[in-house]
Amino acid sequence: MPKTKIAVACQGGGSQTAFTAGALKALCQAQGQGRLKDEFEFVSISGTSGGAVCATLLWYSFMKGERPVWQRMMNFWEENTAQGPVEHAINRFIVESVRMVNSGMMPTLQLSPSSPVMQSMMEFMTAGQRMGFSDFRGLLEKHIDFAEIASWGPQPKPPVLMLGAANVTSGALAKFVSTQEAIRVEHVLASCAVPNIFPAVQIGADAYWDGLFSDNPPVEELIRPRSVGEAHIPDEIWLIKINPTASRRVPVKPGEIVDRRNQLEGNISLFQQLGHLEFMNDLILADAFRPEFLSRFDIKAPVRIPKSFHSDADKPYHIPCIEMPVEFQDLLDYEGKIDRGSENISKLTAEGEKAAAVFLRERAAAVAASSLNEDQTAGQAKSRGEVPDGLPLARWKDPS
């Protein structure tokens, strides 16, 4: 029986993507321990910002054939977490300073991350600290051998890695894809370059900012043969979501407004991409594509994707996404995305593992329900004397 092809898309969110690391760990453990009813394989992994870091670390371990495949990623997060009283004090100072600015209790000091003043301030605050705490590029290079990746060149075999960033000058939505070029540390840094924290990352003649301004995360491109290859079109896209879709209250305080605005901005491109995929899925169900075209890309049915909004009508190809429970979301704020305190990181990682377990159960139920509908529809067609289509997707039609 062929394995279910899975694309995993990891949304950005700074330190809160420790949740993503926990979720990816749980997914890999479930795959390796055979605890899923149907076997699956990761054919592609995409990510933006902190999601790009998690995706790259996991992809690198896959490429090297490491076991457990998630260990390198978790080692990175352990070293990226504040350690000892001095680092925790620096971390608290940064987080609380930003919180006071966002709440209106402290005036905003607008400094460019490229300015000598800002660079001197950061050097002073992190002087004598571990590289893992003070040197993001150095930390990435410690856990990923980019020289080794360069020696590989473009990698056609799965999983395909795709990182999102934004071209500052042209405005183009940039994607760095492992099938097209060797992944560089600059690609990861570009995807993480939040403008008010990091300077734009120069790659060749172009400069890049955080992927929040492009695809957060890349989703639509995961089904395009030009990016992932004809053999790696996924059957399902598993989304690890950081920014909540809904809010239980209208933000009134300055800090609440900053937080909700950041969440909405982080979801705009995601919902647009999911909307495009829904439209494509509906066209497939309407027989808008020739069977030979679908067969060329091994498309037997619509790609399973999550809804954009919980209030959207249910469709046979919908599956849940991996997201934080509402009660946990209520405890977080914008400043938590820069909080590298050990308590914050460990809670996020643990919540990610639990959310992945919930997702696997709910996904299995959704797939089983749609399969039951397929069988019922096929049985009704047979009883009416209809000749079934040669493709399995004909059985996805809602019974009428």
Language-model regions, residue ranges each:
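Patatin-like phospholipase
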Residues: 1-48, 53-400
